[in-house]
A protein has these predicted regions:
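Short arginine-rich
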Residues: 83-95
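GIY-YIG nuclease catalytic motif and its immediate N-terminal context
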Residues: 1-80, 100-101
Length: 101
């Protein structure tokens, strides 16, 4: 049986990404994915997030960047994502706008 990709037992290679608002140059969200990274440097998950964010505002306001590649295991990448969110909160006094957890 295949392990669910959100399971902490998932040992696939993951990456950590950031979505940035071009309007104020602020990071809106940190995210993680085990989707393959395509030739354009984006994964399917990051691309879907960008499409959604940009569709809501009606223009190409948000950009994405993969920050760290090749992180083995879902649990490890979640811990890394949380550290990035904590560092952002320490610097800005709040979490990125789209990071709810």
């Amino acid at each position: 049986m295949t392990k669910h990709r959100n399971s902490h037992n998932n040992e696939l290679s993951h990456h950590l990404y950031a979505v940035t608002d071009k309007k104020d140059n602020d990071i809106v969200k940190y995210g993680i994915s085990s989707d393959p990274i395509d030739k354009d440097g984006l994964s399917g998950r990051l691309r879907r997030q960008l499409r959604l964010f940009n569709a809501v505002v009606g223009w190409a306001r948000f950009i994405g960047k993969i920050l760290v590649k090749g992180i083995k295991g879902r649990k490890k990448v979640e811990l890394m994502e949380n550290e990035y969110i904590k560092a952002y909160k320490k610097e800005h006094g709040r979490k990125p706008r789209a990071n709810r957890k």
